[in-house]
């Protein structure tokens, strides 16, 4: 290191210490949720098992993306009106509901509905979680976003690995665990009540 420059580890520690308690509390439910947030590929695979051809599975993926794009502006507007923490909590609940539904879903129409709702959930997860972080950490937004991506990124991999292992026993086990962890994340979120700014 150049003279006068802090050691990288010291810089990371200092950045972490400067982050607000509210943001650090938010990492708890975010981490629990990430443990159950496995790849969309499992949903696509389940749709194929139900009877969708590979071409139809691609169309389901397109439906998911289209729903996400259409709903995203509405989700953002709703977050501004009712508070982003409520929308984040709604996202956790939507993912729990999706996975519970997948435990019992066995028809094509149910799968179509699932992928529409998944698009709504994804719009919430991709936009409102990050917007909520910006509310909590307006001055250290980049540092907070990096910490959030680091923590959740570490947990996404084991989430898919565990889901894959459970899938070999029964797809219902994988979806059931994801639903349970999503509900647990909701409970932790309500318990720790991470604080946000005026939009809250």
Regions found by a protein language model. Name each.
Residues 71-83, 167:
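Helix-to-loop junctions at the C-terminal end of transmembrane segments
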Residues 65-73, 153-157:
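Residue-level signature of mid-helix packing/kink "hotspots" within the transmembrane helices
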Residues 103-114:
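Helix-loop junctions at membrane interfaces in 12-TM secondary transporters
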Residues 124-137:
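Intracellular juxtamembrane helix-capping segments at the cytosolic ends
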Residues 23-60:
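Helix-loop boundary and gating motifs at the non-cytosolic
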Residues 86-101:
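Structural signature of the two symmetry-related core transmembrane helices
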Residues 1, 176-200:
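Multi-pass alpha-helical transporter architecture, strongest
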Residues 1-29:
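Juxtamembrane intracellular "pre-TM" segments in multi-pass secondary transporters
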């Amino acid at each position: 290191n150049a003279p006068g420059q802090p050691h990288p580890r010291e810089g990371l520690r200092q950045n972490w210490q400067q982050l607000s308690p509210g943001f650090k509390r938010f990492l708890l439910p975010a981490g629990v949720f990430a443990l159950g947030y496995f790849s969309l590929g499992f949903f696509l695979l389940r749709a194929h098992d139900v009877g969708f051809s590979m071409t139809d599975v691609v169309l389901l993926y397109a439906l998911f993306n289209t729903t996400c794009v259409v709903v995203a502006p509405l989700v953002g507007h709703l977050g501004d009106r009712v508070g982003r923490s409520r929308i984040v909590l709604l996202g956790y609940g939507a993912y729990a509901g999706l996975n519970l539904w997948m435990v019992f879903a066995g028809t094509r129409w149910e799968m179509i509905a699932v992928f529409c709702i998944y698009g709504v959930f994804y719009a919430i997860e991709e936009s409102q979680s990050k917007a909520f972080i910006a509310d909590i950490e307006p001055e250290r937004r980049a540092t907070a976003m990096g910490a959030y991506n680091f923590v959740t990124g570490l947990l996404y991999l084991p989430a898919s690995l565990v889901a894959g292992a459970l899938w070999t026993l029964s797809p219902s086990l994988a979806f059931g665990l994801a639903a349970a962890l999503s509900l647990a994340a909701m409970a932790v979120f309500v318990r720790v009540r991470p604080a946000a700014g005026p939009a809250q």
